[in-house]
Amino acid sequence: TKYGLGVGNGTDALEIALKACGVGPGDEVITTSNTAVPTVTAIVNAGAKPCFVDVDEFYLMNSNLLENKINNKTKAIIPVHLYGQSCNMKNINKIAKKNNLYVIEDCAQSHGATYNNKTTGSLGDIGCFSFYPTKILGGYGDGGFITTNNQKLFDKMMRIRFLGMERKKMSSGHWNGKYYAVEHGTNSRLDEVHAAIML
């Protein structure tokens, strides 16, 4: 993808992604019933209600059941790629586009997996990874990463993960050394030690 940013953990990655997409109280987010608690935790922490779709024969989101769960409160879909496999992203993206929904991939258990020669994390609007030691690519403690090709979403996620702050460019083109809090955010950065270990 064009853009990526390190965050504190995979749960934060999902929550930051949801908030960047404008998900909040009164909204619903569709995900699969076969997932770890953090997927649902992120949805609830964003203020939304999780709605579940059953799995297919590969224990991944059954995209054939997806459209029946969509209503006027639905804001996003979180397909969960598991066991090194990718969900049926062609069908999921088609349904999302038809209904004007964001697709946020949960890639915590699919590092390196591909779908039609594209890696997971590059198939939806946003990809969210976890580097917890039990994951396919584990760090030395918690860590997470977010990927996207959308600069607007990337800029918003950069602010959210750093206490809602941004730096302003001066007319000279140089960055002003001061930070400005422009929205609500959190403190969730991938620290240098974990990043260095994973390199």
Residue ranges and their predicted role:
Residues 19-107, 114:
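PLP-dependent aminotransferase-like
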